[in-house]
Amino acid sequence: DKKIEVKSERDVWQKTGNIAIEYECYGKPSGINATESDYWFHNLCIGDETFATIVFDTTSLKRIINNLDKKRSVSGGDNNAARMYLLNLQKLFSSDVIKAFKETKDAA
């Protein structure tokens, strides 16, 4: 059986073009750094409705994040205790990110 992790991004993504991927909370690994899921589902919501869902193989998403030339880290959540990577959606699917992804697979 395959496991999935489901995250929802509400409204702000429309203005910023970014999604947030949590990696730490209260100084401990969380989100992408703690998940045991095989797949990461990221819902893009408008209000209470799901506009679209992006599905990543979790290992691939980690590889993409690790190979990004620029990634912004921000605090958020309750008490600003969570640390998250802000990933720009256009950048995420750009040719240079896809090329780097292919190159890291070839190098493995």
Model-derived regions, located:
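Non-catalytic C-terminal interaction segments of nucleic acid-processing enzymes
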Residues: G27, G47-A108
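Intrinsically disordered, low-complexity, compositionally biased regions/tails
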Residues: I21, T35, N80-A81
